Amino acid sequence: MNTQTTLLQASRWKPWEPVLWLLAFAAPLVLPSHALIINEIAIVALFAVSLDLVLGYTGIVSLGHAAFFGMGAYSAALFAKHIHPDPLVGMVFAVGTSTVLGALCSLTVMRGTDLTRLMVTLGIGLILMELANKLDWLTGGADGLQGVMMGPVLGQFEFDLYGRTAAFYSLTVLLLCFLLARRFVHSPLGGTLKAIDKAVRYAKEMV
């Protein structure tokens, strides 16, 4: 059995996985009064998926993961406020800014050991948090960004106070990002990263 066959078998869905996703998407309909909470759960779950991709599969320890999450959130909000309120375009812009930030931080983070990465990522997170609080003319500071109005998704689905559209939007983004992360993990590159992580662990055990 070659490597590609092994990766393909590992990427196949378990029987219970589609059921879990169907239950997640049914939740805003079954529990409409809790749609806002479901939206928050989907957002935190997306954060967990991205952190698991970095820590669980590649073994890179990070204490500043929230910095990239916050960069994306502020980028999308500022884009909607000053340029265009379309949530999909804003999401693409947020992904771009977070990617640029990650690429810049990687120049420092990837040069150190685990302890160095911990301190550097923690420092990056604290610096960006302090900037978000101090640059109140841009970010709103501790009061948060005001006056952000998101347009309808695909020009059809308006965001409202009940949070149903937001819940479905966040769940859809979560599912798409989960599929991308899953595909990456079970790709040859993902297999290489996992192999490197295991090799480092075995080497530490032998010392």
Language-model features, listed with the residues they occupy:
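Transmembrane alpha-helices and adjacent helix-loop boundaries
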Residues: M1-V207
